[in-house]
């Protein structure tokens, strides 16, 4: 398998953590991508092969062993989950629906964080304060919801985290990494305590975000 990726993308981090937790990371050939800082509002040169594999030209994109291009992090994680032999990050016993409900909120939180990042990269003259406030409000609501459902974040001993837990952890980590984002911890003690422990998982520590090369 081949993965187009960037170390800054929380969606890429989701795929990498899922692969590591499932023991599949060694089967993936990583293809780094570069993104000029105007990626959020302009068409930029794409890393060779990315747009050909995925016309959306979005990362992460995974080329499967069968040559199928999967250009969505959720779809990629579903594929990786299907390759696992005994443990899963997406339940197959009916538990996928409660997990999926929390996952959708955590994934929407990532979308709001990245949307803010793209808007922050726009020149001041065309940056929308209203759009930024909309994303901040969405982020706050999502973190509040995850705090209210913090009991669902607990990973039983000896088990793998599910995709909702992985994505919630990534959202917390992204909020910490971008210094223009507010601290998610005040007023959310359960989420704060959970993340303090979850962030120490090897797959989390090995995938801490860093800036993407511009060229």
Label for each model-derived stretch:
Residues 1-129:
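GST-like domain detector, emphasizing the conserved glutathione-binding G-site
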Residues 77, 81, 100-103, 143, ...:
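Non-transmembrane alpha-helical segments in soluble domains
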Residues 84, 150-153, 202:
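A general structural signal marking secondary-structure boundaries and capping sites
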Residues 87-92, 155-159, 184, 205-210:
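Short, hydrophobic secondary-structure boundary micro-motifs
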Residues 106-196:
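GST-like fold's C-terminal all-alpha helical module
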Residues 183-215:
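Long hydrophobic alpha-helical segments typical of transmembrane helices together
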């Amino acid at each position: 398998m081949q993965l187009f990726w960037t170390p800054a993308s929380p969606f890429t981090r989701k795929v990498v953590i899922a692969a590591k937790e499932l023991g599949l990371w060694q089967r993936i050939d990583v293809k780094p991508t570069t993104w000029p800082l105007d990626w959020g509002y302009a068409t930029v040169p794409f890393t060779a092969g990315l747009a050909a594999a995925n016309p959306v030209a979005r990362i992460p994109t995974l080329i499967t062993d069968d040559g199928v291009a999967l250009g969505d992090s959720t779809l990629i994680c579903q594929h990786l989950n299907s390759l696992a032999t005994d443990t899963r990050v997406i339940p197959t016993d009916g538990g996928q629906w409660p997990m999926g409900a929390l996952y959708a909120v955590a994934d929407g939180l990532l979308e709001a964080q990245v949307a803010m990042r793209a808007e922050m990269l726009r020149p001041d003259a065309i940056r929308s304060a209203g759009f930024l406030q909309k994303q901040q409000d969405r982020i706050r609501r999502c973190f509040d919801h995850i705090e209210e459902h913090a009991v669902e974040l607990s990973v039983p001993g000896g088990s793998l985290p599910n995709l909702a837990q992985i994505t919630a952890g990534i959202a917390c980590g992204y909020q910490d990494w971008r210094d223009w984002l507010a601290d998610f911890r005040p007023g959310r003690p359960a989420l704060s305590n959970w993340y303090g422990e979850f962030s120490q998982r090897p797959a989390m520590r090995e995938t801490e975000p860093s800036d993407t090369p511009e060229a």
